[in-house]
Design a protein with these regions (language model features):
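PLP-dependent enzyme catalytic core of the Aspartate aminotransferase-like
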Residues: 1, 325, 329-381
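Conserved active-site segment immediately N-terminal to the catalytic lysine
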Residues: 175-187
């Protein structure tokens, strides 16, 4: 089965083998060596000199770590939302006492400097601005996160970014962008199994975290910082998943991080070229189309279940439907991890055949040619 869903993604045989070993003591020198390797390599992907931690939790747990460590009583938290994961960020900050401003962005737009500036002007002082870099549920990506962060810092607000699907698929560049607390996960563009979260914590975030009198017992980042000084975790980690993550990061860096990003860009170019040939309508507005996951409205007379089931049963390709209140309104195709020309082309071919069988007349041959051409143009052999 070919996984073209927005996570979990397929993993390399090396990553699978890395998990097939006997357990070790998480207070041993062997584990400390493993932890050091993960952190040092993860910093290269985050492009940060800040502290990086691995939490035994999902990406959502990483977001909760940010909310629980940064939110002071009465803090005003602005969350520009364009989908479900923005809503979940808002829920997390609200659960920890934040006064959350849920700013729904309209017309298929994601967070962008103009929108964030307008919201800050409208709502006055805020302490934290939090948003997903890439909104997986609607296929919408943020624009110019660096400028968003500059505007927020100018107003005295910290910037928290959910980069769970973005890291490894696009250049996040935490330090250059000015992200204070960045959360990611391994099961998307890093091509590792789910079950841990990666977080980077910058100086501005630490200043606030260390002032906080009550921190969560499990997600206490100060505690994690103290343990990281000796390359350990405060609590028993998912050692097997640490091995997998370590191997996945090594694969990316051996392949070449720039090349890894270019391959994702080529996959996006090929995928969108094919999808546009089919005249599908995207949830994202022009300029906000996610290169990581494409979300399309369902063509008239079809259902997402019919499209997905035909893709799975007839072609062995798994794609996604909508989540929560988007269920039944869209279908989604991801471009993450071990993406290749063959996977993109096969997906475009299969989708075209399925659309034709369900009553939408499309030119499969032209779509495949355009997908191949755009992939090759962006990632020459």
């Amino acid at each position: 089965m070919l996984l073209m869903i927005p996570g979990p993604t397929e993993i390399d045989e090396r990553v699978i083998r890395a998990m097939a070993r006997q357990m070790i003591d998480h207070r041993s020198e062997e584990f400390r060596t493993l932890m050091k390797s993960i952190v040092e390599n993860a910093k290269k992907i985050f492009e940060t000199k800040s502290d990086v931690f691995v939490l035994t939790a999902s990406g959502t747990g990483g977001v909760e770590a940010a909310a629980s460590n940064l939110t002071m009583p009465g803090d005003r938290v602005l969350v520009p939302m364009c989908g479900l994961f923005g809503e979940r960020m808002a829920d997390a900050f609200e659960a920890y006492g934040g006064h959350v401003i849920r700013a729904k962005l309209e017309n298929g737009q994601g967070p962008n400097p103009e929108a964030v500036k307008k919201l800050l002007d409208e709502h006055g002082h805020v302490d934290i601005v939090a948003f997903p870099y890439n909104e997986t549920s609607t296929g919408i990506i943020s624009q110019n996160v660096k400028e968003i962060a500059r505007i927020c810092h100018e107003r005295g607000a910290l910037v928290v970014v959910d980069a769970v699907t973005a890291l490894g698929g696009v250049r996040v560049a935490v330090d250059e962008a000015g992200i204070d607390f960045c959360v990611s996960g391994p099961q998307k563009c890093l091509a590792a199994p789910p079950g841990v979260a990666l977080v980077s914590v910058g100086e501005r975030a630490w200043e606030k975290i260390e002032r906080k009198k009550t921190r969560p017992p499990y997600f206490d980042m100060v505690k994690y910082k103290h343990f990281l000084e000796r390359w350990e975790t405060p609590f028993t980690p998912a050692v097997t998943l640490f091995w997998a993550l370590d191997e996945a990061l090594k694969i990316i860096l051996e392949y070449g991080y720039e090349k890894w990003l270019r391959r994702h860009a080529a996959g996006a170019a090929g995928l969108y070229a094919g999808l546009r040939t089919y005249e599908l309508e995207f949830y994202a507005a022009k300029g906000f189309e996610s290169p990581i996951v494409s979300a399309m409205h369902i063509p008239p007379g079809m259902t997402d279940v019919a499209i997905r089931e035909a893709m799975k049963k007839q072609y062995g390709i798994l794609i996604s439907g909508g989540l929560a209140h988007y269920k039944g309104k869209m279908f989604r195709i991801a471009n993450i991890g071990l993406i290749s020309r063959e996977k993109i082309v096969n997906t475009i071919f299969a989708l075209g055949k399925v659309l034709n069988s369900l009553g939408k007349s499309v030119d499969v041959e032209t779509a495949v040619e355009r997908a191949e051409k755009e992939f090759d143009r962006n990632f020459p052999a």
